[in-house]
Amino acid sequence: MQKKSSSKSHRATRGPSQRQLRAGELIRRALSDVVTRGTIQDPDLIERSFSVTEVRVSPDLRHATCFVAPLGKGDAAALAAALTRVRGYLRGQLSKEVTFKYMPDLTFEPDTSFDKAEQIDRLLHSPKVSQDLSPQDDEE
């Protein structure tokens, strides 16, 4: 008879659960709604356009990491720092929008996925890689 692997080690190899994904999407949408209302009084966030691109929630739903990206050119790290300053206010507003047993503690991080995608795109279009991807005439 084989032993079952522990759920913790099995969970570590898999991605987030359906519950985590659903909670993250609810928080992302509600956070976007709160931000678009324009009720945040922080001087670094007034008249600033940005997007909440993703929210990752811990398995116990007590912590949420919100990834933010400025629209247009801007400093994503400064944006994340400004949102961190008003996270108490945002958490309170979120509690009015979504119902959880415990409202997750919010952490804001700059979203670097767009930068990584741009870097990969530049690499794929570089002359060295292009010559490897183009068909050779002598192979036909």
From Swiss-Prot:
Monomer. Binds 30S ribosomal subunits, but not 50S ribosomal subunits or 70S ribosomes. The gene is rbfA. It is found in: Cytoplasm. Keywords: Cytoplasm, Ribosome biogenesis. Gene3D superfamilies: 3.30.300.20. The keyword Cytoplasm applies. GO terms for cellular component: cytosol. GO terms for biological process: maturation of SSU-rRNA. This is Ribosome-binding factor A. Its main location: cytoplasm. InterPro entries: KH_dom-like_a/b, RbfA, RbfA_dom_sf. GO terms for molecular function: ribosomal small subunit binding. Belongs to the RbfA family. One of several proteins that assist in the late maturation steps of the functional core of the 30S ribosomal subunit. Associates with free 30S ribosomal subunits (but not with 30S subunits that are part of 70S ribosomes or polysomes). Required for efficient processing of 16S rRNA. May interact with the 5'-terminal helix region of 16S rRNA.
